[in-house]
Amino acid sequence: MENLSVDLLYMAAALMMGLAAIGAAIGIGILGGKFLEGAARQPDLIPLLRTQFFIVMGLVDAIPMIAVGLGLYVMFAVA
């Protein structure tokens, strides 16, 4: 029975890391599309849009890093 709970913790950590990566990939894809759409509509605002794009992209990319840290914590510290 002990082995089953450890296996479930490993599966939970894998799901946490995988779903966070998939969500971030979808978010960055949508963000890139909106950036290109905004740049095509108003080319004179490209420097402002680029700055905001990279700030938000960094925030979106930080979520999977946090999830990987939590997943590794669950795998090695809790289990």
Swiss-Prot record:
It is found in: Cell inner membrane. It is a multi-pass membrane protein. InterPro entries: ATP_synth_csu_bac/chlpt (IPR005953), ATP_synth_F0_csu (IPR000454), ATP_synth_F0_csu_DDCD_BS (IPR020537), ATP_synth_F0_csu_sf (IPR038662), ATPase_proteolipid_c-like_dom (IPR002379), F/V-ATP_Csub_sf (IPR035921). SUPFAM superfamilies: F1F0 ATP synthase subunit C. The keyword Nuclease does not apply. The record marks 61 as: Reversibly protonated during proton transport. Keywords: ATP synthesis, Cell inner membrane, Cell membrane, CF(0), Hydrogen ion transport, Ion transport, Lipid-binding, Membrane, Transmembrane, Transmembrane helix, Transport. It comes from the Bacteria. This is ATP synthase subunit c. It comes from Pectobacterium atrosepticum (strain SCRI 1043 / ATCC BAA-672) (Erwinia carotovora subsp. atroseptica). The gene is atpE.
